[in-house]
Regions:
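A detector for small-residue-rich transmembrane helices and their helix-helix packing motifs
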Residues: 2-178
Length: 178
């Protein structure tokens, strides 16, 4: 029995760590949103404005800025699910992968985006979905392939928002693509 209890403690600790980072980021998402609302200000200027120096800071700050509560809630749920899957299945490389996705999605958006402000965590979300799907298939380990299938089942429809066809002009399809 002690070995079983010890294994349970290890699994609880690993699961706890898989949730800490995602919840910390979600807390920051919501805190920024609440500060923006309480101060009656607009943080859109902390987004990315492609090919302009004024938009470079957005590579770091864009995922924290959301247009409204609907945008924030949609990103929050998806971000939580995908980041927990990332940090639970790839705990040794998850932080590195997360940071690379964060930075590269911002840089790519800065290069390819329309000349307007782009905000939200969609680039990071799409990047995590892409990583979880591809990595699971390429590594050919059953739990990771299962994760790939979960991602496709839950978020396979996201692919249609990577193209400008039929999307509202205020939605950054470039942010999804990057």
């Amino acid at each position: 029995m002690p070995i079983f209890k010890e294994n349970m403690d290890i699994h609880k600790r690993l699961l706890y760590h898989a949730f800490v980072f995602p919840f910390l980021f979600l807390f920051i998402f919501w805190l920024v949103f609440l500060v923006e609302r309480v101060l009656y200000t607009d943080f859109t200027v902390f987004g990315i404005f492609p090919l302009a120096t004024k938009g470079l800071l957005g590579i770091i700050t864009m995922p924290f800025i959301h247009a409204d509560s609907t945008h924030l809630l949609a990103n929050s749920v998806t971000f939580l699910v995908l980041s927990v899957l990332l940090f639970s299945n790839y705990r040794h490389i998850a932080l590195k992968v997360f940071i690379l996705i964060w930075l590269f999605s911002g840089v790519i958006l800065w290069v390819i985006g329309r000349p307007s402000w782009h905000i939200g965590a969609s680039g990071v979300i799409y990047g995590m979905a892409f990583f979880l799907f591809c990595s699971g298939l390429l590594r050919k380990k059953i739990p990771l392939v299962a994760t790939s299938l979960v991602v496709v089942f839950l978020y396979g429809g996201m692919v249609w928002y990577m193209f400008p066809l039929g999307i509202d002009n205020h939605i950054s399809w470039e942010g999804h693509l990057s």
